[in-house]
């Protein structure tokens, strides 16, 4: 009996620190699978860090750098404008003009349609500072600004109100997506809206979006600027 108690006491004393501290005990032999795709949880942690950090390659500095490029081109092009030429700037909205970061975090980087509809209805999305700078620069030179968004037509009033509340005022047009064929791509829709602007007599000198599908297709702007967005993809 004494020997049994001694062994039990030895086991208790030997392993108690590990149990109490919650330290994992790694297996002596471990075979790991091949996982070419990074772990989703780790990627989400990296996205949070990328958004919040302040190094030159982080989210906010990258946004501002792209905005600076856009403003430089805008000033150059306005100076070269011909008499009577109608110049236009085209802007996407989500993650280009307005930030949905709070909602993205709330849904853990997923897309829940009802949540996004409720978020858009609140009209609380703040402006993306760099894009607002471009907008104000354009308006100061008399350049017309057109928004082309993938938001549905049902969100027109809420979207317009949110844009104005965020500081975007005195724009020329707001295009939202109505009923469309299921096979119509974002590029097809947005390039079609740009065609309407060109047909109205404007020269699109600058187009800014966070997705390549905001910029691809014809007619294209004379100069296009892609903003960073590793948070979601719209092909």
Identify the residue ranges that each predicted region occupies.
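C-terminal cap/substrate-recognition subdomain and adjoining C-terminal extension
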Residues: 25-41, 45, 57, 143, ...
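Non-catalytic pre-domain segments flanking phosphatase-related domains
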Residues: 18-91
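Metal-dependent phosphoesterase signature
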Residues: 99, 104-127
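Asp-based phosphoryl-transfer active-site loop
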Residues: 88-100
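Short, acidic loop-to-helix structural element flanking the phosphoryl-transfer center
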Residues: 116-146, 153-154
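Positively charged n-region of N-terminal signal peptides that target proteins for export
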Residues: 1-5
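Bacterial N-terminal signal peptides
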Residues: 8-19
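Stable alpha-helical elements in mature extracytoplasmic
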Residues: 59, 63-66, 70, 127-134, ...
